[in-house]
């Protein structure tokens, strides 16, 4: 976002909680989604992500036990790299994903149509409205910002900036609609990883083989809809990752946060001492850690070396 001048987009100012040092722990979509959905038990190694299920670690299933109906929406089919099925088999995501029915906004690098984000959000809004007041937990995955996307039915690649602008605008429209609906919603936004719009001495722009800090340092955000916190916004400056997100969701439930118009407890108390996670990132063939203020990388079975910026 900084690379294309969108780090101060108006919608980002509407969020109540901003994780300033959030680590996505990977630079690819599949493991990022698995890490989020399996976040209750902390950060496993890349290999352990694919070692089967532990329902106690799965945030959606933990919420289902409490009576929350599960929903899932995507702006794509979920078929590439067996994405959706891996979330079902490895993270217990139970809802069936409907056929991609949205107006096409982009074409992905593999010719798959990518649906219009606004239409996806509208489908979500209509679905939860039909719940007639029931509680729900929804997982939405969007690939509109993925590298290699083209404008619909065009050969030309779609630059990151107009796609990011459109996504942020659509996110703002979603927030507006939810506020008008009168529903109480905790909206959590966690980017899978950065877009690598700028390269460095190790990787050229758009290359994500190594999960460098420039790629894994992402703006995780939380917006409470249906309450007006008096001390908003607050920033979480400590090193965090997915465990902090699932822990925050737990605190919202434990405190009955939506019980008062201004929130049951101050935001600063809600985020106080959230679990910290040291900056460790992994892909299948690369690991990156921060140690004593410096970043180090390990490729395959080679020795650790300092990451040149």
Named regions from a protein language model:
Residues 56-57, 61, 65, 78-82, ...:
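Membrane-interface soluble catalytic domains
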Residues 41, 149-157, 200-203, 230-234:
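Short acidic, glycine/proline-rich loop/turn micro-motifs
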Residues 179-184, 190-228:
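Histidine-centered active-site microenvironments of extracellular/periplasmic hydrolases
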Residues 5, 115-132, 150-190, 197, ...:
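A long, amphipathic alpha-helix that forms part
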Residues 144, 162, 172, 286-288:
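Polyampholytic, low-complexity intrinsically disordered segments
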Residues 32, 214-218, 241:
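Residues that flank catalytic or metal-binding motifs in active/ligand-binding sites
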Residues 1-151, 242, 251-253, 262-265:
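Active-site-proximal alpha/beta segments of enzymes that process anionic O-linked groups
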